[in-house]
């Protein structure tokens, strides 16, 4: 590939509004009983299609609001989270959407905020303040963003008791003058240029084998700072036949089936469990139950059966 081809490819990736799709973490692709159509149902622009047991994202229709990433139970849809995490840190827990007036760190749409991002920011600053524009007429996310954001906050509180305040309009603070506005715009442009390449998602082949998705790493980091957590986990009851179904449908490889001597043993990596319920729905004898793990179990691998 020539230099110009590489430059064009990098530009196209940088301007593509779609989240990255990892089919190996998609419940539809995994053939989980009941499947999954949450991303299809939440997309305000009809940019999501479910075709051939996988998710297809329309580059033209997608606005990059991020709502699909928040509802995906297997973290199969994701944006690079490092830049948003840094913006929350620079803003000391304050962030605005791109349509909110005033100054401060910004993200394209508050729909891109995940439970992990909110919980991790809360573990640093205690309170997170978010400013939104007029979602009802916004062409990026639309009127469902506030409700969806509230659900993300509730999920985030499983990992850290974060307090979140959402305001419409400017972030609390002094109004910005003309000179300060120009400096803020200039600084924003410089940051955008500097962060453009680092913000690109890694190709699937570049991910480290066995590494948790970024969203789960943020949740785990927040949980390590919390007094107590309600991390999702599963329990296997009597009647398990040690078949491989639960391991096959698990989107994050949280469940392992290991041969030990003449028998198989099931293990759960708690930090990798999202509580998606794929194993619960797909278990042939229906002996798997969803529970909550305390803080001390989050970093453990537990024997299930």
Place the predicted regions along the sequence by residue:
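Flanking helices and flexible, charged tails adjoining ferredoxin-like Fe-S electron-transfer domains
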Residues: 1-18, 23-24, 28, 67-174, ...
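Ferredoxin-like iron-sulfur electron-transfer modules
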Residues: 8-35, 46-64, 82-85, 171, ...
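A structural signal for short beta-strand/turn segments enriched in small hydrophobics and glycine
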Residues: 36-39, 43, 68, 72, ...
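Basic (Lys/Arg-enriched) interaction patch that binds polyanionic ligands
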Residues: 55, 60-71, 175-179, 183-184
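Catalytic cofactor-binding cores of redox enzymes
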Residues: 164, 176, 180, 219
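N-terminal secretory signal peptides and thylakoid transit peptides that target proteins
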Residues: 170-196
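Extended, charge-rich helix/loop segments that form flexible
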Residues: 185, 191, 195-213
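A glycine- and small/hydrophobic-rich beta-loop-beta segment
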Residues: 213-219
């Amino acid at each position: 590939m020539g230099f110009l081809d590489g430059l064009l490819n990098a530009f196209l990736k940088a301007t593509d509004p779609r989240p990255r799709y990892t089919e190996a973490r998609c419940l539809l692709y995994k053939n989980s009983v009941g499947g999954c159509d949450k991303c299809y149902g939440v997309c305000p622009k009809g940019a999501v299609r479910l075709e051939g047991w996988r998710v297809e994202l329309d580059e033209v229709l997608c606005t990059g609001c991020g709502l699909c990433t928040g509802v995906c139970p297997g973290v199969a849809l994701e944006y690079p989270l490092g830049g948003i995490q840094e913006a929350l840190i620079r803003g000391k827990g304050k962030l605005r959407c791109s349509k909110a007036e005033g100054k401060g760190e910004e993200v394209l749409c508050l729909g891109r905020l995940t439970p992990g991002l909110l919980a991790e920011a809360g573990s640093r600053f205690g309170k997170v303040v978010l400013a939104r524009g007029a979602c009802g007429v916004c062409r990026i996310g639309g009127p469902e963003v506030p409700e969806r954001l509230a659900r993300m906050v509730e999920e985030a509180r499983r990992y850290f008791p974060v307090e979140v305040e959402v305001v419409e309009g400017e972030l609390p603070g002094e109004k910005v003058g003309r000179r300060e506005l120009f400096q803020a715009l200039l600084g924003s442009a410089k940051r955008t240029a500097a962060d453009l390449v680092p913000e690109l998602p890694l190709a699937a082949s570049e991910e480290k084998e066995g590494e948790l998705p970024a969203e789960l790493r943020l949740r785990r980091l927040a949980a390590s700072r919390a007094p107590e957590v309600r991390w999702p986990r599963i329990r296997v009851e009597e009647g398990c036949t040690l078949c491989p179904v639960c391991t096959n449908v698990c989107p994050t490889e949280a469940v392992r089936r290991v041969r030990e001597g003449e028998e198989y043993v099931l293990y759960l990596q708690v930090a990798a469990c999202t509580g998606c319920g794929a194993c619960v729905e797909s278990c042939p004898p229906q002996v798997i139950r969803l529970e909550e793990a305390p803080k001390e179990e989050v970093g453990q691998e537990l024997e299930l059966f």
